[in-house]
Design a protein with these regions (language model features):
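Acidic, proline/glycine-rich low-complexity IDRs
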Residues: 1-108
Length: 108
């Protein structure tokens, strides 16, 4: 079993550790406008970044991305869960994860 880097938690208590793009798609698809209105993805230890997806009253989703180490805070809206999960997966891949081994480049 690999190291845990981050988790996705929904308002209704569902949790997925290190969620794949497909797992994020399922969690966002399960959102509704009454009792499961958001999903938050962040590292468990010392969360210096997070992403959230929330249902909008007028339809669609609000996506918030915050990374304190890079002084970034973006808020967007979207309607396509496919686009949201793809963009979040790419964005999360560029984040710093406490405890994750650093990449080393070696010349041969």
């Amino acid at each position: 079993m690999g190291a845990q880097y981050y988790g996705a938690d929904s308002e209704n208590g569902d949790r997925i550790d290190d969620p794949s793009e497909d797992a994020l798609f399922m969690m966002i698809s399960d959102l509704n406008d009454s009792d499961n209105t958001f999903v938050v993805v962040q590292p468990d230890d010392d969360p210096v970044w997070f992403a959230s997806v929330a249902v909008l009253d007028e339809g669609g989703y609000e996506i918030v991305r915050r990374d304190t180490t890079r002084n970034k805070h973006d808020v967007t809206t979207a309607t396509s869960i496919n686009d949201i999960t793809r963009d979040l997966t790419i964005w999360m891949a560029a984040r710093d994860f406490p405890g994750r081994p650093t990449k080393q480049i070696r010349e041969f």
